[in-house]
Amino acid sequence: MKRVSDYQFNFRFYRFGLIIVLVIGVHSISGYAQPDMTLKNTLPESGKLVNDNPTGKGWTNLLSSAEEWNFENAFWQLNNNTLRGTINREKEHHYSYTKKSYSDFELVVLIKMVGDEDANSGVCVRINPTSWDDAPGYQVDMGKGYWGSLWEERKAGMVQKYPDSLAMKVAKKNDWNHYYIIAKGHHIQAWLNGVKTIDIVHGTGYAEGRIGFQLCHMHNPTIVEIKSLYVREMK
């Protein structure tokens, strides 16, 4: 027959074990790896562009036809393999996104955002739009306080923050910026101009969705241009 002290010991051991399980469970849902804080260029060969074209086989140009996209003509135009978005003191967000959904993939893009200090945009991955101004899912973000960070619209909010003090040394204001993004399972990685700014396993996010871009409402006009947008799906 067990003594009362035995039951107390077992209960404490059980409680301790439960805490360990919960901690492990939390890390499995949202496991943070370390993005690059050294500002070194660690861009993989697969993410490089040569004459604005990706290297290797299997890449698909996502800007070859407007027929492959959903967007409002009042805010977005696609011509000559360049997608251009313009917003001027509008109250809503305005998204453009592919008609096709993607799950596991590599993505490379050149993107330029021109606006004031508050200008904001983002490369959207695995989004599931409900309207032109609502698109739950991930954004590889752009803008002061957000460059190089991973945001999840309508869900977790800031998933992984890249220090603004470093991001402002990497990002090119009012100029072309290169993003390379890998989404495989719940593991999301991204490089901004060759520097790895996102590396996280986020188990609660969407595993599939559209690829797109955001025009964020601001007090002053913002122009976003996208070119050399290629995707390579993973099997």
Predicted regions and their residues:
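Serine residues within intrinsically disordered or low-complexity segments
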Residues: 5, 28-30
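Bacterial N-terminal signal peptides
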Residues: 17-27
